[in-house]
Amino acid sequence: LKSLTVLAESPVESRELLTELGVEKVIVEGKTAARVTQGDSDKPKQVPPNQEGKEEAPVATAAQPKEPAEQPDAKEGPAEGQQPGGVDNAAEASPAAVSPSRPQPAESEVGNSSPGEKGSDAPSTEARGMELEGKEEEGEAMVEDEEEAKIPKAAQPKSESKENAEDNESGSTDSGQENSGETRLLRSGTYSDRTESKAYAAVTHKCEDCGKEFTHTGNFKRHIRIHTGEKPFSCRECNKAFSDPAACKAHEKTHSPLKPYGCEECGKSYRLISLLNLHKKRHTGEAKYRCDDCGKLFTTSGNLKRHQLVHSGEKPYQCDYCGRSFSDPTSKMRHLETHDTDKEHKCPHCDKKFNQVGNLKAHLKIHIADGPLKCRECGNEFTTSGNLKRHLRIHSGEKPYVCVHCQRQFADPGALQAHVPIHTGEKPCQCLICGKAFTQASSLIAHVRHDTGEKPYVCERCGKRFVQSSQLANHIRHHDNIRPHKCTVCNKAFVNVGDLSKHIIIHTGEKPFLCDKCGRGFNRVDNLRSHVKTVHQGKAGMKILEPEDGSELNIVTVASDDMVTLATEALAATAVTQLTVVPVAAAVTADETEALKAEITKAVKQVQEADPNTQILYACDSCGEKFLDATSLAQHVRIHTAQALVMFQADTDFYQQYGAAAATWQTEQVIPATELLFRPRDSPQEAPAAPLAPVPLAGEGQAPAE
């Protein structure tokens, strides 16, 4: 203790004494700390707040009275920086402590201190000596404690980093230091620097049901809802439930008719900005996913994969009710609504029913007066811009969708899609009861209900029942006398566009409904059905000619010198013995149909006058189809715009008049099966044998040849 009391009287002796005590490191580091402190004295010193109850400032304050007490002369300035107790004081000392040439404060200034401070000098010195003796026994532990007491805060990076780490764990941030670029240790033992540490990626969540792993807890929770079926998020408009909040938010926007996100290139609007961004890629050329079959571009690989199912024909999504398959799940969901007859949501304006409240709300936009989606031509209103565009094509006559098989044009893509199976023969919808197949599911449903007698759609005004909801909707328009579709030629109005299309055919003369048996055209499909039932199924007095006793049919013809003869396989298969043609104009128009009918009738009368018992059969010289009356043949010839062939069956007496000559003419004119015979128009026709002279046309005043 005596050695420590006179420690500051001689710097050399102090150094030697402390070396013997094993605390030389304190002296050396004290100098270094003093020099560092003196060099930084001009800069503002950052004094961090006291943390965790550490009172470091009172230690430096208590060391201040030691210097005057131990050095009464106060003339050796550099020795102050070497004293263990004056290191902290040197950083805040007067300029005399920095420069040894300047005088130190007088002893009287020290005497101005309070008596309590003077009285604390002796206890402080004794405590210091006892502390050094304890540290001498503990070795380096004393050195670390002295460093913490003497080194300024700016020179303690380790302690500061520990304190900052504690602050970061508690959520606070030290304003004096920023730990950007440093790796912080979190409570979980992982590192916050995701790019430098692999511990973050190693933390995964594994699904026990399917084994899928996730690195984010939120994604893992959303995935779990797939297995549990939990849907905690519901729409505020229709109460539809969702398992994901983003999907719920996107769904709620569908209830709003507003589409605030518009494309600057084409003006198309979208409800979601994500859909707009995908649309813009088509203009910028960023749609990099190209179909190898048709060259169409897509913005996402998912859309490309769904599109490729069209070319491959793969339809993995199958309806559980009718067995119809679809290439995407959205089409299947729309199809399933056709099987759902429980439509509890009813429109208060037009009595139309829906199976979902969202569809009802979309329908209610039709009844909004002066709505944004209103046709300027007829005033009809629509819920979507797509439906309005398709409707406007009715007024403009635009038909951008063309069938690749027959080049027929359509205004609606759905109509084209329903038309294509006519050429391909595809009928995916098959009745499980009778096996009959249909091209559309709606036709199958109507067929099943027709067999069962089910008519679930009832008109509340008159009680009439219907098989399909569209039939009921059209029926209700008749009650309300709503006829929005008007003919531009005669201004006649119709309830639906289908009736208008049927009416327009009257003005154009078009007969698009053709009979596949005889080729006759009709302007209405119901007329075609009536024709097939009455003509081609043995009804309405149709004469079916059959040979008696196994003999072949004998045919007598009416001929002309300037006609074209065209025999086909169909004619050859009927065991014909003789054939010629009736004179008809080369091209038959709609106005010339009656004239053609009159010409054929005259030729028939001429033959009937010769033999009243003759049975008559009419046939087309272009395709060989046979008919029962002149009207049917005249209508059919319009399809080919060619000549008409009239075939007659004569009785046995007629052929007996010609004897062997008839057999000779027969061998010359019989057409073998599967052989086609063409004669050019301007080539002279070979005259038959003399006994079989052609019968002249009626009206020329000549009797049949005998």
Swiss-Prot record:
A zinc finger (C2H2-type) spans 205-227, 233-255, 261-283, 289-311, 317-339, 345-367, 373-395, 401-423, 427-450, 457-479, 485-507, 513-536, 618-640. GO terms for biological process: negative regulation of transcription by RNA polymerase II; regulation of cytokine production; regulation of immune system process. The keyword Ligase does not apply. SMART domains: ZnF_C2H2. Residues 67-78 have a biased composition (Basic and acidic residues). Keywords: DNA-binding, Metal-binding, Nucleus, Repeat, Transcription, Transcription regulation, Zinc, Zinc-finger. Residues 90-106, 687-698 have a biased composition (Low complexity). Disulfide bonds: none annotated. It holds the Pfam family zf-C2H2. It comes from the Eukaryota. GO terms for cellular component: nucleoplasm. It is found in: Nucleus. GO terms for molecular function: DNA-binding transcription repressor activity, RNA polymerase II-specific; RNA polymerase II cis-regulatory region sequence-specific DNA binding; zinc ion binding. Residues 1-12 form the BTB domain. Residues 134-148 have a biased composition (Acidic residues). Residues 32-194, 680-706 are annotated as: Disordered. Coiled coil: none annotated. Residues 170-182 have a biased composition (Polar residues). Transmembrane segments: none annotated. InterPro entries: Ikaros_C2H2-ZF (IPR050589), Znf-C2H2_11 (IPR041697), Znf_C2H2_sf (IPR036236), Znf_C2H2_type (IPR013087). The keyword Metal-binding applies. Belongs to the krueppel C2H2-type zinc-finger protein family. Transcription factor that can function as an activator or repressor depending on its binding partners, and by targeting negative regulators of cell cycle progression. Plays a critical role in early lymphocyte development, where it is essential to prevent apoptosis in lymphoid precursors, allowing them to survive in response to IL7 and undergo proper lineage commitment. Has been shown to bind to the promoters of adenovirus major late protein and cyclin D1 and activate transcription. Required for early embryonic development during gastrulation. Represses RB1 transcription. This is Zinc finger and BTB domain-containing protein 17. The gene is ZBTB17.
